[in-house]
A protein has these predicted regions:
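Extracellular/periplasmic juxtamembrane helices and adjacent flexible linkers that interface
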Residues: 268-350
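Short beta-strand->loop
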Residues: 47-49, 140-142, 160-186, 200-204, ...
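Periplasmic-binding protein-like
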Residues: 130-134, 197-201, 208-209, 241-274, ...
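Short helix-loop capping/hinge motifs at secondary-structure junctions, enriched
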Residues: 143-149, 168, 181-189, 267-275
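Sec/Tat signal peptide C-region and signal peptidase I cleavage site
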Residues: 36-40
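N-terminal segment of the mature folded domain
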Residues: 41-169, 310-311, 343-350
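Bacterial N-terminal signal peptides that target proteins for export
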Residues: 16-27
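Ligand-binding pocket segment of bilobal, Venus flytrap-like solute-binding proteins
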Residues: 186-252
Length: 350
């Protein structure tokens, strides 16, 4: 200000107003930032496999109610569904999932190997971090006209088997491993298992691309005498095509198909959602969640819930992937990679 000049009260007022305005803006911005962070800490993204959308829709509602009751806080769970392996790639490439819930352990291992989930993810939750399972069974046409009861019936002359290509779908990989393991469970050697699986695929008229394609081939195109699929798909078939179209046949032995889950460490470290993500996956083991799984024909780990739904989940002897194959990762290398056992045993058109 020039010497002898009186201060301009309006200039001072303007400076004060401007400073006040800036302060309000700063406070508002800070509030929004903190509020957004707080909201993010009560919001999860579950990236899951395609056919689990109905189960998780019901589970999320149950978890939100449980979380509100026990903590007094609201929580919002968003879902993303697609093929399990495609989802794993999306998360690896940057999709900010807080948790992943897949249907094959190889997809979680892929993320673990890339540092996205913990290396020891399978030890973070009970049952090797698989709160639910399914198994492989046979769907036959109503009345079971070919009298198919067990694995040996699938290699008989004149029996056509519909199955997913094990190189393109987890459904197919589990079917292949179940057939192989069924021989081993009866005391057979790997050589005898390979011989059986080779005969098995000679009765496969066409390999389906995926589970839904296999169902379409069997029920819409009317090809085959038996469809090998997940137990959890029986409800879907009845819902889409109507009850009475097929009969479910439980073989003497089958494989345990695990549904693994994991916290995405990369995301929760950034968002501060680690405790919430763990609580979300922990609650999958609760009786309420296990009941919801049973409702959707997903086999619960809880023996009590399983027994309660014994009319739906028939008793069946099961073996794990680890028992004969080490892991799904090892099975992939030995059996399903190019030049592996499957390529040696399967010849299209024969």
């Amino acid at each position: 200000m020039a010497p002898g000049r009186m201060p301009d009260p309006y200039q001072s007022l303007g400076d004060t107003c401007m400073n006040s305005s800036r302060l309000k803006t700063l406070v508002a911005t800070l509030a929004l930032t903190l509020g957004g962070a707080a909201f993010a800490q009560n919001q999860l993204l579950n990236v899951s496999y395609d056919v689990a959308r109905e189960f998780y829709k019901d589970y999320n509602a149950a978890f939100a109610a449980h979380y509100k009751k026990t903590t007094g806080k609201d929580v919002k769970v968003d879902q993303s569904h697609a093929g399990s392996s495609a989802q794993a790639r999306a998360v690896n490439d940057g999709l900010d999932a807080d948790v992943v819930t897949f249907n094959t352990t190889t997809d979680v291992e892929f993320l673990a190997n890339n540092g996205v989930v913990a290396k020891d993810w399978a030890k973070r939750f009970p049952h090797d971090a698989s709160p639910t399972t399914s198994t492989m069974l046979f769907l036959v046409r109503n009345g079971n006209p070919k009298n198919i009861k067990d694995w040996d019936d699938l290699i008989k002359p004149g029996v056509q088997v519909v199955v997913v290509n094990p190189k393109t779908g987890g459904n197919g990989r589990y079917a292949y491993l179940a057939a192989w393991g069924a021989v081993r469970e009866k005391g057979g050697t790997d050589a005898q298992a390979a011989d059986f699986v080779g005969k098995f695929y000679k009765n496969v008229p066409v390999l389906a691309k995926g589970g839904r394609d296999a169902t379409s081939i069997f029920l819409q195109r009317n090809i085959g005498d038996v469809l090998i699929t997940f137990e959890s798909e029986v409800v879907s078939v009845d819902r889409e095509f109507g009850k009475g179209k097929v009969d479910a046949v439980y073989p003497s032995v089958s494989i345990t198909a695990e549904n693994p889950v994991a916290v995405v460490e990369r995301t929760v470290a950034k968002k501060g959602t680690g405790a919430l993500a763990k609580a979300y996956l922990d609650y999958l083991y609760s009786d309420e969640a296990q009941e919801i799984a049973a409702k959707h024909a997903i086999r619960p780990r809880s023996e009590a819930v399983l027994k309660k739904h014994a009319d739906q989940f028939k008793p069946i002897k099961q073996f794990t992937v680890a028992k004969y194959f080490g892991s799904l990762t090892e099975a992939q290398k030995v059996h399903f990679n190019d030049g592996g056992q499957f390529d040696k045993l399967y010849t299209p058109g024969k």
